[in-house]
């Protein structure tokens, strides 16, 4: 028999396209017979057969083993769509019917058979592919989506009788206008690799090369990506390179040995899944090729890698030490992805303090482009959940992120993980009455979109969704019938548009010179103010997090300027307290403190925020003198107050 030629890179752990050889592929044998060639890596197996509907799932066609540990067979007369499995006789004496690890499609759950599939979709997205990049100095505003619960298809039902799903192409037609209306640049899909359990949301994978059949075929998914690209929207795939589902018909003890997983106590994760063995080079090639499939075959624009903390450290526990094999694999994976698809975006969900996660591999970094800022997320949500009267005591929570921000290339994420399992949704986490939650939600998102870092929001955040996410139900679209929720989604769209149209909010955001605190000592007042700078532009961001307004609040600047209001979270359009005819521009006055010689005075609404565009004006030569005099007067006033307090104490 002519064995398939397995590239040496597969055995060295450096292969990114093993799916071109392993799995099932249409071919013609030396005698001219058309059929399908099957190849599976199972070095510990004593025998393997291909079974399917073609023989009634009985005896099967025996496969032959090469010295490489790869079993292969050619079967004529099969057709695309036929189902098959491998009966693997394991080293432990077992004989188990297993799905093909490299199959391109699998039947709908609860079925687990692999499906003969050709990948021959033709894209027409050349213009997009040529201009896409990593968005270093461009907006990156990601919509995180679970394809099965964003919206259900009216009148359709699933095989189990529940509300129907849109297929991939139908989903594109519904979704793309919403993404464009809300100025998202990319959609990030929760894992679409095949998985048996809906409740895992795709994070307990069995078919790493199979696009889940829940929502259609591989060709329909390619059509989804193509449609997004034609409308200028990137597609990012959520990928699970750390652990896999322990189902007996999939990868677990595939050939009767611990082939893909560790054989010790670190072989099982906290979720009951199996941890990949990164010290097995063929496993590294398996994972690299699975990532490569999304980038190459399906034209995805990036990959978000899940649970990276569980790879960097054994069982995700720094006390157990660094898993150097995993670190080496991730470096190799990111290096290979960037070498082959240099304009792709590669992101890590990592909650650890592991160093240089986003540093290039040539500088001994792990090589990711961005890392989720879990600290920013926790501090922000904790602060806004705090009662107003207690906020002065935790004022520093909203300052802390900028102390470490430049250590990595961070992305700010309010993801699906924050709106499930009793954590409450974003709006429901906030302190206060319904009206106070509404006002604070606008300000929280103002803080997110004016803070340095790329952005990601889970579907429903833009609706101010009150119900926690449930993968079995679609979003509560009827919320848009209520004035606040309709106004909020319009505010969210306006905020996203502002983010996309103001270069100072994204250009140079990883450069410390492009950010400056203006007010970060206003603990009692709950006011924060900062400058964003880029392309010669200065934007002043001002945020009041208390439940009372501040009249004539002074902000001290280093230069004289006029200030034009760009965005007001309390505008009546969004359900705020301000009327349309209110003042839109302001000017600094001479005199300040702290070496800042000019003062901008604003009336700050309760729980409200302003974004202002600053235009420099000619300086007053006496401004420094006035500022010094004002500082001296304040110093004398403080000394006088201290003396009076001391005299009272003596009495």
Regions found by a protein language model. Give the residues of each.
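Short catalytic/ligand-binding loop motif for oxyanion handling, primarily in non-cytosolic enzymes
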Residues: 95-96, 151-153, 195-198, 243-247, ...
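Carbohydrate-interacting/catalytic domains
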Residues: 1-140, 168-179, 183, 436-438, ...
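Substrate-binding/active-site clefts of carbohydrate-active enzymes
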Residues: 107, 127-137, 146-322
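Conserved alpha/beta catalytic core and glycan-binding cleft of carbohydrate-active enzymes
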Residues: 109-110, 299-301, 315-472, 500-555, ...
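Short, contiguous acidic/charged loop-to-helix segments that flank catalytic cores in large enzymes
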Residues: 212-216, 278, 320-322, 430-436, ...
């Amino acid at each position: 028999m002519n064995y398939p030629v397995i590239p040496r890179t597969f055995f060295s752990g450096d292969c990114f396209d093993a799916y071109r050889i392993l799995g099932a592929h249409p071919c013609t044998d030396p005698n001219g017979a058309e059929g399908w060639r099957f190849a599976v890596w199972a070095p510990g197996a004593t025998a393997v057969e291909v079974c399917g509907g073609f023989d009634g799932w009985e005896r099967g066609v025996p496969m032959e083993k090469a010295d490489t540990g790869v079993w292969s067979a050619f079967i004529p007369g099969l057709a695309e769509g036929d189902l098959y499995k491998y009966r693997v006789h394991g080293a432990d004496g077992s004989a188990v019917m297993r799905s093909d690890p490299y199959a391109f499609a699998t039947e709908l759950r609860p079925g687990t058979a692999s499906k003969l599939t050709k990948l021959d979709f033709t894209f027409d997205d050349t213009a997009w592919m040529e201009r896409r990049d990593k968005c270093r100095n461009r907006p990156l505003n990601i919509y995180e989506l679970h394809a099965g619960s964003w919206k259900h298809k009216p009148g359709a039902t699933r095989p189990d009788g529940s509300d129907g799903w849109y297929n991939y192409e139908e989903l594109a037609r519904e979704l793309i206008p919403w993404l464009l209306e809300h100025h998202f640049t990319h959609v990030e899909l929760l894992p679409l690799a095949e998985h048996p359990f809906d409740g895992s949301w795709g994070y307990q994978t069995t078919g790493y090369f199979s696009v889940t059949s829940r929502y259609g075929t591989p060709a329909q998914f390619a059509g989804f990506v193509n449609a997004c690209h034609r409308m200028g929207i990137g597609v990012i795939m959520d990928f699970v390179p750390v652990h896999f589902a322990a189902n007996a018909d999939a990868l677990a003890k595939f050939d009767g040995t611990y082939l893909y997983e560790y054989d010790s106590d670190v072989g099982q994760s906290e979720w009951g899944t199996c941890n990949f063995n990164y010290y097995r080079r063929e496993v590294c090639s398996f994972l690299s090729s699975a990532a490569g499939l999304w980038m190459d075959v399906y034209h995805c624009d990036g990959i978000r890698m899940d649970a990276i903390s569980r790879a960097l450290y054994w069982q995700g526990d720094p006390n157990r030490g660094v898993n150097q094999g995993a670190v080496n694999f991730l470096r190799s994976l990111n290096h290979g992805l960037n070498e082959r698809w240099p304009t792709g975006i590669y992101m890590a969900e990592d909650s650890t303090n592991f160093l240089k996660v986003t540093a290039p591999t040539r500088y001994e970094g792990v090589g990711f482009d961005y890392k989720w800022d879990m600290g920013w997320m926790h501090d922000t949500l904790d602060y806004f959940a705090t009662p107003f009267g207690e906020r002065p005591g935790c004022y520093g929570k909203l300052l802390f992120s900028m102390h470490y921000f430049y250590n990595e290339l961070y992305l700010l994420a309010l993801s699906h993980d924050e709106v499930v399992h009793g954590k409450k949704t974003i709006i429901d986490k906030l302190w206060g009455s319904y009206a106070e939650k509404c006002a604070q939600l606008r300000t929280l998102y103002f803080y997110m979109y004016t803070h340095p870092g790329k952005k990601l929001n889970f579907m429903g955040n833009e609706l101010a969704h009150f119900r926690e996410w449930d993968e079995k139900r679609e979003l509560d679209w009827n919320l848009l019938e209520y004035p606040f929720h309709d106004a909020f989604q319009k505010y969210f769209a306006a905020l996203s548009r502002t983010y996309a149209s103001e270069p100072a909010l994204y250009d140079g955001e990883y450069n410390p010179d492009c950010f400056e605190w203006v007010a970060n000592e206003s603990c009692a007042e709950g006011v924060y103010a900062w400058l964003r700078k880029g392309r010669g532009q200065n934007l002043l961001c001002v945020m009041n997090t208390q439940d009372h307004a501040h009249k004539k609040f002074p902000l001290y600047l280093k230069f004289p300027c006029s200030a034009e209001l760009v965005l007001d979270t309390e505008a009546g359009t969004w359900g705020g307290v301000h009327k349309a005819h209110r003042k839109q521009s302001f000017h600094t006055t001479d005199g300040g403190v702290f070496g800042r010689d000019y003062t901008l005075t604003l009336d700050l609404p309760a729980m409200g925020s302003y974004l202002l565009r600053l235009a420099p004006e000619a300086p007053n030569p006496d401004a420094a003198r006035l500022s010094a005099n004002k500082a001296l007067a304040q110093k004398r006033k403080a000394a006088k107050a201290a003396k009076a307090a001391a005299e009272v104490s003596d009495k």
